[in-house]
């Protein structure tokens, strides 16, 4: 007698342990799942709604300064250490893990204009209104010892900014001119001057480390090579640039924060026009910093908000504000790509999540898989009207909201004026300037 028996391999359905999930047999043939797209759309819509529900970006506020925060510096070796300088000459070293100040130094008489940490993390430099550059030890002095700077350099003019080389014992200061200093010398190795106006900010390139850039009060951005005795290139804009930042992943790309409410991303090889114009702020942009991945940047503005922009996008993906936060003067992105720190006029440093709805802490494998799945669904359906509307919706203060409406009216009026001028002029006599090129006045080699 012949008996036919169904034979199954136990490895296909038996769990190894009791804690494992039950294996569910699935057939991925599209013909068997005609409503797959509609189910995915519903899941993407729910994921987008939940993202906005759980968007609580504010983490903590570090208070202790007795005057407005003027500058912030990150520690290159420690994620939990941040330094800040205030308008009363005070420098504080913060422990972000404990959310408390670990050390306070009265560094200068007047404003602390600039702050940078040495590449090894053992010391830091400050410049102030008292015409001095001071180097301080990162470690606290022993019991009974007086807090004194390791070195003090007395300058001839006021210093307005400072930045340290990524891997050499060299730093740059700016004021009436840009000076390149060796840490062991009391006189600058090189000095660069182009024009008579003062320079407000200087930054080293973290990739091409011999290149640095500065921005001045004469509306210019100047590029330098510290191996050459003269500046490389100068670009003059319509309005003044307040701060600069180099992309940490792309050697030739930098972004400038401008007084005309915009940020301009340039390729230093082609300075005739910016690569991208980042709009959305309604007041002067005071500071800018890149994420460690080089894919996003954060800006601080006089309109009491900070915004996060994707590098390839002209509009922000996120805007952060609070009722108490006043004009934001400085901003930094943490080295682990998780947090954003900003300092403002009302003497506080605030810590924000880089991704507003991100869950902090350790994720289980199932949580991580669900997050990745939801993220892919949101990317797949991001251009659908309903999902796009929910994802873009943000609550704004009334002042910012009314200024946005006012600027839209002004922009439309300028557009109509240009159209009418072109309509009543000889064909071709009135050119159509692009948004990128119309703010660049001249490039000087």
Swiss-Prot record:
Alphabetized Gene3D superfamilies for the sequence: YVTN repeat-like/Quinoprotein amine dehydrogenase
Subunit field text: Part of the small subunit (SSU) processome, composed of more than 70 proteins and the RNA chaperone small nucleolar RNA (snoRNA) U3. Component of the DCX(DCAF13) E3 ubiquitin ligase complex, at least composed of CUL4 (CUL4A or CUL4B), DDB1, DCAF13 and RBX1.
Domain of life: Eukaryota
Organism of provenance: Xenopus laevis (African clawed frog)
Name used for this protein in its record: DDB1- and CUL4-associated factor 13
Chief place of localization: nucleus
Pathway: Protein modification; protein ubiquitination
Example of a GO cellular component annotation carried by this entry: nucleolus
Region entry Required for nucleolar location, spans: 353-441
Subcellular location per the Swiss-Prot or TrEMBL entry: Nucleus, Nucleolus
